[in-house]
């Protein structure tokens, strides 16, 4: 979401999927340097990491590199997850139809680019759950959930989910 990138994280808004892909690859290169002792030499279009001093080198992790997870909604970020990550975090606004018709094919395209398959990517995602100890709490929770869904529905980046159902406008 552009507002988060520019105003929350104070970063330039350009090519978010390409930047994320490169950030994940750079992170993997750093972990590889730590785990193998290889000289760090990552050079990309957005990031460059070529110095790993002994002071910042934690040494080999006996458990290996951590699993990488990425959330996404649109096809480009979802493809990046399929290409580079171990786990894809589906957005709570994602529907079963959108997951089957848009998300999974995008994950497959990304995985294929990296010589992987969909089975190499764990898919996880949150649900909207409404609970309460009594009717009043339940109604309050329902209203909060409705507001959250309405917010997501009004966010242009999530429009693809609505369009998948024919609810674009």
Label for each model-derived stretch:
Residues 1-3, 94, 127-131:
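Active-site-proximal loop/turn and secondary-structure-junction residues that shape catalytic pockets
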Residues 2-11, 83-85:
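Acidic/polar active-site rim loop that often engages polyanionic ligands
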Residues 9, 13-59, 101-169:
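An alpha-helical appendage that flanks or caps ligand/catalytic pockets
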Residues 29, 86-87:
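Well-ordered beta-strand positions
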Residues 61-67, 84-86, 116-121:
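Short, well-ordered coil/turn segments that N-cap beta-strands
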Residues 62-73, 129-132:
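Active-site mouth loops of central-metabolism enzymes
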Residues 68-71, 88-90, 121-127:
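Hydrophobic faces of well-ordered beta-strands that scaffold small-molecule active sites
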Residues 72-80:
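Short, acidic/polar
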